[in-house]
Amino acid sequence: MRDDQGQHESVVVRACGEIDLDTAPGLHRELARALTERREVVLDLSGVTFMDCAGLGALVRARNQAERCGARLVLRGAGGCVVRLLRLTGLHRRLTVEP
């Protein structure tokens, strides 16, 4: 789900449930599309209950695309399981993570 914010500068992409090998490609497609259309993409992870390495891969690819496009990717509302995974892998230092 996407919500436009302000003057078409940013968009919120809401993820929910499990982000895994089956669902990560869809998340990546949505983030890639949003990053080509907006200067800032906020990924709301508050509804995510599980994430595996495929989900992390989608986040890293989106971050790399954001850098190439001159856009900003922000992760917001990540719960315990996602925060733990980001910290264990060190990605919390490479991705913009907000409460």
Task: Label each residue range with its predicted role.
Residues 1-50, 61-99:
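STAS-like cytosolic regulatory interaction modules
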